[in-house]
Amino acid sequence: MFERQSNNPEPIEVSDNNPERESTADALLTTRIYISNLDYSSTEDELIEYLKDYKPLSVLVPSHTVRGFRSNHVKPLGIAYADFETPEKAREAVEALNETNFKNRNLKVKLYVPFSPENVCKPAPKPRRLSKLRRSKKPADEENNAASQDPTVEATQERGQASEDPENAANNAKQAKPTSDDTVYCGYLPKNTTDADLREHFKDYNPQEIWIFRTRAAKGPMHLQLHRHYTAALITLNSPETIAKIAEVTSTKKILGKKISVKPAYISKIQEVKKIAEQTGIAERNQTNKGAIKPNSGNGGQPAGPGVAGEPSNPQQNCDNSNNVQPGVSVVA
């Protein structure tokens, strides 16, 4: 037979698992205090004397050992723990000694809270921030036409514009630099390239003035950049063909067995080379040697203009080829 159950069952006890409430209760019942911002020279005996009005049972100053190659030394952590007879004495010490001055430092005194993994505070999630591109406002004309556009097409256009803008900006920056109508830039020339080699390479386009110089390019990240020097030249031509066409044709040919780069020269590069030549006196020396060019120097026997790397009659007047600079211009790009 079944027994009749009582209509008044005993109350069920429900435990409160709130970590914050438990830690607060533990702190109220603890007999230990935690002291921070302590002077590193403080000793346990000095703290016992400082806390004597509250009858501490023990004082602990934690430290750690710093191990060196030849010796070890103990370094305090700047904190201390003190135990008292009752929780009331501990709370009394906290209320009286917090923010008091001890050895020219304001002590931070509070009740000790035992460590528990549940009491560890989790870091708050960082707010998500939109990129500058997504925060940027749409132009007024796009806002006016937003209602009539397909949302899928609009999103595709925005993604395409975001990916193409950096490249287009770089190309526009390059196109903005003006180029010469009669001068080409030859890069990555062989180290021993001479004036005669370049005149032979561009013989179909009547080369006039030639500047051979060294330039420098940096590769790699900023903190590990490797600087590579290479030979380049500026060549002024007298031809009905456009400079772009000449650069396209001559880029397919090799000089001394090496493929080179030929493109229209930037006017700023031409001005830079000539300015350095004027500063170093190269243009004046070439002007002085204008009539000292042999008929077989590669320019049809005509006197060389300023900066033409012809063959002087006096070998001692020729530029130093060890620097790969003819006629003596050294440019660092």
UniProtKB/Swiss-Prot annotation:
Stretches for region Disordered: 1-22, 123-185, 281-333
InterPro entries per UniProt: Nucleotide-bd_a/b_plait_sf, RBD_domain_sf, RRM_dom, Rrt5_RRM1, Rrt5_RRM2
Annotated SUPFAM superfamilies: RNA-binding domain, RBD
Domain of life: Eukaryota
Pfam family, one: RRM_1
An example Gene Ontology molecular-function term: RNA binding
Biased composition (Gly residues): 298-308
Keyword 4Fe-4S listed: no
Biased composition (Basic residues): 125-137
Record domain RRM: where: 31-114, 182-267
Skewed-composition ranges (Polar residues): 145-160, 169-182, 313-327
Keyword vocabulary terms for this entry: Repeat, RNA-binding, Transcription, Transcription regulation
Family per similarity comment: Belongs to the RRT5 family.
Function statement: May be involved in the modulation of rDNA transcription.
Protein name: Regulator of rDNA transcription protein 5
Gene from which the chain derives: RRT5
